[in-house]
Amino acid sequence: MTLESKSTSSTKKKKSNNFDIYLASSSPRRSEILENLKVNFEILKCDYDESNFTDESPEDFVIKNTQQKCLAAHAIRQQKKLPNKPILTADTIVALDGKIFGKPENKDHAIAMLLEFSGRRHSVMTCVCFGETDPQSDTEVSMMFDLVRTEIQFANLTANQCAKYWETNEPKDKALSFGSLVSQYFAH
């Protein structure tokens, strides 16, 4: 477990108490969002097995994953006796016909996934969880969460289009290889 300070001021401070929340995520995109919002935060890395809720609906899966990440981060913070600050977690999944699609393992896997979505409507779900620990007990965690679901219709895709998209390097660490450039393949 490591801490990494992210400050929006011109001088970055490492391992200080001068931050507002913990971000329990290693996602560069989530860090970028908080930086753009001028939130002072520290990254609290916690290893959490996201396969615990594989029998759940996509909605329940993403909600439970986000909440459990928050509880896991709280346990690490408490174990390491770190300052009691709120914890922010998030998770994004892509689902088609009730099946959850994760990050691609390689180029061939990414192309196969994208072709499965070709010409079809699917859901992108993001859950954000904000957890606070009771300052008196430092054990009870109160959590608030919100789930946003977006329905997206893909245009018909060819294997060549999918391969070219993979070569942009954008999709390699995202659920369903889903980066901003993929929007060119949405049916309008």
Residue ranges: model-predicted function:
Residues 28, 48, 135:
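Short, glycine/serine-rich, charged loops/turns that create anion-binding
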Residues 2-6, 10-22, 35, 57-188:
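Anionic-ligand binding patches
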Residues 18-44:
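N-terminal G-site helix/loop of the GST-like fold
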Residues 45-52:
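Short, acidic/turn-prone active-site loops that include or flank metal/cofactor-
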